[in-house]
């Protein structure tokens, strides 16, 4: 697999926006970027795989859950430059709303933990800036009855 750091081309990834009991499921990442920070579960689209198939596969791999893929909420771009000015990471991330349809919630090999967060909990977390901004933009959809 092509190295994720200092890539030749942008990488396409998916994010899974999964609400369970009115709480947002986040994964604590093991690998950069955002290592040891809470963010949406997800990962890269594999060659020959549709985006929605990638969402289903990543959900199962990272959370142990089978899901129904809902609507595309947003396309997020992450372009991170190294100190020398060259591109360290370049991701195009497609974040999909999803609902759990089966399985047992269990952290996969790419994550160190999974946890459900309500709106108040999220305000106390150190989140990657793109994750925090995404949640803020979609707070009314994700937490319609919470105090914002």
Residue positions per predicted region:
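N-terminal first-folded block
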Residues: 12, 17-54
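Short loop segments at secondary-structure junctions
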Residues: 20-23, 30, 99-104, 119-121
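Conserved N-terminal beta-strand and adjoining loop/helix that marks the start
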Residues: 1-24, 97-99
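A generic structural micro-feature
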Residues: 6-10, 37, 85-92, 111
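NUDIX/MutT-family hydrolases
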Residues: 95-97, 106-137
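Active-site-adjacent beta-strand/loop module that shapes the phosphate/pyrophosphate-binding cleft
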Residues: 77-104
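Acidic/histidine-enriched, glycine/proline-rich intrinsically disordered or flexible terminal extensions
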Residues: 141-148
